[in-house]
C-alpha cells in the first residue's frame, strides 16, 4: 500500500508499524552477546562458541530488520515527513545517550588518573603498565578518522547537489577508511602489553576505546548499507534520512575519538 493509497484510509501521517519479531530477537541476541563477553573475561570454557553464535544471530536478525525498514521506506512509502522527523529526533536522542555513556567513561578515567592511589603506585599509568604510544598506531588512526570525516562530507555534498558519482565515490572511500581504522585498532589491541583485566587502567582504557571500536564496526555496516542503497537509486537529494543519520554518526564518532586520543593516549601517558 503506497502513501497515496494509505492516505485515503487514515487521517494522520504517522506509520503504524506492523508486528515484527526483530526487536525482541535482536534484544535477546545482544543480551547473549553481552553475557558471552562477560564469560570471556572470566575464562569460562567454550565461551568463544557463544560469542560466535551471538554475533551471527545479531548480524542475521539486524540484516532482516534493515530489510523490512528499507522496504517500508522505499517501496511502501511509509516514511512520510512526520515519520522522518520522528526518526531524526530518535537518532538525536540516541546520540545524546552515547555522549553521556562516554562522559561517564571519561569521568572514570580522570577519577583514577588525577589522583592515583597507593595500590597503583601513586603514578599514572600504574606501575607495571606499558601504555600505548600516542605517536604510533593511535596517531595513524586519528589521521584516518579525520580523513573519513572529510570524505563523508564530500559524499554528502555530492548527494545533495545531485552529483551521484561524487556521492558514491566519497561513500566508498569512507567505508574503506573505516575498515582500515578498525583493522589498525584490532592490531593495536592484539599487540598491547596489557589487557582489560589489568587493573583500573586496563578496564577503563578498553571500555572507552573498545566501545568506540564497536561503534566503528556499526558505522562500517551502516556505510555499506547506504552505499548499496545509493547504487540502487533508493536515495534522492531530498529523501535520505538513513544516509543523513549515518553522516551525523560518523562526525560524532570522529569527535569522540579526538577526545579519546587526547585523554587516553596523549595526556594519560
From Swiss-Prot:
The residue ranges crossing the membrane are 21-41, 45-65, 90-110, 138-160, 167-187, 205-225, 247-267
Q: Name one Pfam family in it.
A: COX3
Principal localisation: mitochondrion
**Which transformation does this protein catalyse, written as a reaction?**
4 Fe(II)-[cytochrome c] + O2 + 8 H(+)(in) = 4 Fe(III)-[cytochrome c] + 2 H2O + 4 H(+)(out)
Tell me its EC number(s), please: 7.1.1.9
Q: Does the keyword Transmembrane helix apply?
A: yes
Q: How does it sit in the membrane?
A: Multi-pass membrane protein
List GO molecular-function terms, semicolon-separated. cytochrome-c oxidase activity
Q: Name one GO cellular component term.
A: mitochondrial inner membrane
Keyword set, alphabetical order = Membrane, Mitochondrion, Mitochondrion inner membrane, Translocase, Transmembrane, Transmembrane helix
Q: Which Gene Ontology biological process is one annotated for this entry?
A: mitochondrial electron transport, cytochrome c to oxygen
Please give the CDD domains that the UniProt record associates with this protein.
Cyt_c_Oxidase_III
Annotated localization: Mitochondrion inner membrane
Q: What does this protein do?
A: Component of the cytochrome c oxidase, the last enzyme in the mitochondrial electron transport chain which drives oxidative phosphorylation. The respiratory chain contains 3 multisubunit complexes succinate dehydrogenase (complex II, CII), ubiquinol-cytochrome c oxidoreductase (cytochrome b-c1 complex, complex III, CIII) and cytochrome c oxidase (complex IV, CIV), that cooperate to transfer electrons derived from NADH and succinate to molecular oxygen, creating an electrochemical gradient over the inner membrane that drives transmembrane transport and the ATP synthase.
**So what family is this one in?**
Belongs to the cytochrome c oxidase subunit 3 family.
Subunit details for this protein?
A: Component of the cytochrome c oxidase (complex IV, CIV), a multisubunit enzyme composed of a catalytic core of 3 subunits and several supernumerary subunits. The complex exists as a monomer or a dimer and forms supercomplexes (SCs) in the inner mitochondrial membrane with ubiquinol-cytochrome c oxidoreductase (cytochrome b-c1 complex, complex III, CIII).
Q: Per its record, how is this protein called by name?
A: Cytochrome c oxidase subunit 3
UniProt lists the gene as: COX3
Amino acid at each position: 500500500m503506497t502513501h497515496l493509497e494509505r492516505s485515503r484510509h487514515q487521517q494522520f501521517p504517522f506509520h503504524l508499524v506492523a508486528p515484527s519479531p526483530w526487536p525482541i530477537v535482536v534484544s535477546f541476541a545482544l543480551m547473549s552477546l553481552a553475557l558471552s563477553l562477560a564469560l570471556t573475561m572470566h575464562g569460562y570454557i567454550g565461551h568463544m562458541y557463544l560469542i560466535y553464535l551471538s554475533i551471527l544471530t545479531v548480524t542475521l536478525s539486524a540484516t532482516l530488520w534493515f530489510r523490512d525498514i528499507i522496504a517500508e521506506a522505499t517501496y511502501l512509502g511509509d516514511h512520510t515527513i512526520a515519520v522522518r522527523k520522528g526518526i531524526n529526533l530518535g537518532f538525536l536522542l540516541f546520540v545524546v545517550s552515547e555522549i553521556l555513556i562516554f562522559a561517564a567513561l571519561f569521568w572514570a578515567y580522570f577519577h583514577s588518573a588525577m589522583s592515583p592511589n597507593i595500590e597503583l603506585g601513586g603514578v599514572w599509568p600504574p606501575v607495571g603498565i606499558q601504555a600505548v604510544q600516542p605517536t604510533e598506531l593511535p596517531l595513524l588512526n586519528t589521521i584516518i578518522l579525520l580523513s573519513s570525516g572529510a570524505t563523508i562530507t564530500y559524499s554528502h555534498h555530492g548527494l545533495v547537489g545531485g552529483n551521484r558519482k561524487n556521492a558514491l565515490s566519497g561513500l566508498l572511500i569512507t567505508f574503506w577508511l573505516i575498515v582500515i581504522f578498525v583493522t589498525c585498532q584490532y592490531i593495536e589491541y592484539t599487540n598491547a602489553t596489557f589487557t582489560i583485566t589489568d587493573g583500573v587502567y586496563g578496564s577503563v582504557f578498553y571500555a572507552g576505546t573498545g566501545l568506540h571500536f564497536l561503534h566503528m564496526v556499526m558505522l562500517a555496516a551502516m556505510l555499506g548499507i547506504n552505499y548499496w542503497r545509493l547504487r540502487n537509486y533508493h536515495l534522492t537529494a531530498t529523501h535520505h534520512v538513513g544516509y543523513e543519520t549515518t553522516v551525523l554518526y560518523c562526525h560524532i564518532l570522529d569527535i569522540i575519538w579526538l577526545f579519546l586520543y587526547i585523554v587516553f593516549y596523549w595526556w594519560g601517558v
